[in-house]
A protein has these predicted regions:
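Alpha-helical transmembrane segments of helical membrane proteins, especially in multi-pass transport
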Residues: 173, 177-209, 223-245
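Hydrophobic transmembrane alpha-helices of secondary-active transporters
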Residues: 76-83, 202-212
Length: 288
C-alpha cells in the first residue's frame, strides 16, 4: 500500500516535471522565433535609437571629413586621367573639364547624402520584409497548452521507467533549446550590429564611386548594403519554412519523444540556415 502510494506520487512528480519542461521548452522556442520576425523587420533607426544617433553622429563628425579628403584625392586622380587619356595631351579637348565638374558635383552630392542613401536601402528592405510577413506564416510556434490535459492523461498510463526516460530527454532537449536560443540571438543581434558598423563608414567608400578604377570600392559597399538589407527577407523565409515544419509536429503521448527530438532538429536546422543567410545574401548580390 505504501509502495503503491510512493509509486503514484513519484509518477505524478515525473509527469509534472515532463509537462513543465516541455512547456518551458516550447515557450522559449516560440518566444525566440517570434522575436526574429519582429527584430529583422526594424530599420536601424527603429531598432535602438540611442545606438543609431551615436553611429550617425560619429559618421557625420569623424568619417565625413576623412571622406572629403579621399574624395579630393580621387577627383584629382580622375582629372589627371581625363587629361592624359587622349593620346598623351596631343588630342586635348576642353569639354573634359565640364565632364570632370559634373563628376565632382555628383561625387559631392553622393557623399553629402550618404546617410539618406543608406537609410533608403534599409527602408526598401524593411518594406519588403513587412509585405512578406503577411504571406509567411506568422504563428511559427507549437501550442502545447491545448494538449496538456490529454498529454497528462496519456502519460498516466506509462511506467515509471518510461516516464523517467522521457523526463531525462525533456531536460536534455530543454538545455539544448536554451543553447539554440542563444544562437538565434547571436544571429539577429549580430546582423544589426553589423548594419551599424557598415553604415558608420559609408561616406568613405561612396567617395570613390565616380572613379573608374576606385569605383569598385563604392559599388561593392552598395552591394554589401543591399545584402545586409535583404538578409532580413531571407531570415523571414527561414522562419516561414520553420513554421510549416513545426506545424506538422504531433504532440501525442505515443509520439511525444519523437516530437521533442523533431522540434529540436527543426530548431537546429533553423539556426544553421540563419547563420547561412549572411553569406547567401552576399553571394546573391555579388558582395565580398
Amino acid at each position: 500500500m505504501i509502495f503503491d502510494a510512493i509509486q503514484e506520487w513519484f509518477q505524478e512528480l515525473l509527469i509534472d516535471g515532463i509537462i513543465s519542461n516541455l512547456t518551458g521548452m516550447f515557450d522559449t522556442l516560440n518566444t525566440k522565433v517570434g522575436e526574429i520576425a519582429g527584430e529583422v523587420g526594424m530599420t536601424p533607426s527603429a531598432w535602438t535609437r540611442g545606438i543609431f544617433n551615436m553611429v550617425r553622429s560619429l559618421s557625420e563628425t569623424v568619417i565625413v571629413p576623412i571622406a572629403s579628403i579621399v574624395l579630393t584625392f580621387v577627383m584629382c586622380y580622375e582629372l589627371i586621367q581625363l587629361i592624359i587619356e587622349k593620346n598623351n595631351l596631343h588630342d586635348f579637348d576642353t569639354w573634359i573639364f565640364f565632364k570632370w565638374i559634373f563628376k565632382t558635383f555628383c561625387a559631392v552630392l553622393i557623399v553629402t547624402n550618404t546617410w539618406n542613401i543608406v537609410m533608403a536601402v534599409f527602408d526598401v528592405a524593411q518594406n519588403v520584409v513587412s509585405q512578406s510577413a503577411g504571406v509567411i506564416i506568422s504563428d511559427a510556434g507549437i501550442d502545447i497548452s491545448g494538449v496538456t490535459a490529454d498529454l497528462e492523461t496519456q502519460l498516466a498510463d506509462w511506467s515509471i521507467g518510461a516516464l523517467l526516460g522521457l523526463w531525462f530527454q525533456s531536460i536534455f532537449v530543454g538545455l539544448c533549446t536554451q543553447i539554440l536560443s542563444i544562437c538565434i540571438f547571436l544571429v539577429i543581434y549580430g546582423r544589426m550590429i553589423e548594419v551599424y558598423l557598415v553604415t558608420s563608414i559609408g561616406p568613405i567608400p561612396f567617395a570613390t564611386m565616380v572613379n573608374r578604377e576606385w569605383g569598385n570600392t563604392g559599388q561593392n559597399y552598395l552591394r554589401s548594403l543591399l545584402a545586409l538589407g535583404f538578409q532580413a527577407f531571407l531570415i523571414m523565409i527561414c522562419v516561414g519554412i520553420y513554421a510549416v515544419l513545426v506545424e506538422g509536429i504531433s504532440l501525442s503521448g505515443d509520439n511525444i519523444s519523437g516530437a521533442i527530438w523533431g522540434c529540436m532538429g527543426y530548431t537546429v536546422l533553423l539556426c544553421f540556415t540563419l547563420f547561412k543567410t549572411g553569406s547567401l545574401a552576399k553571394s546573391l548580390f555579388g558582395a565580398h
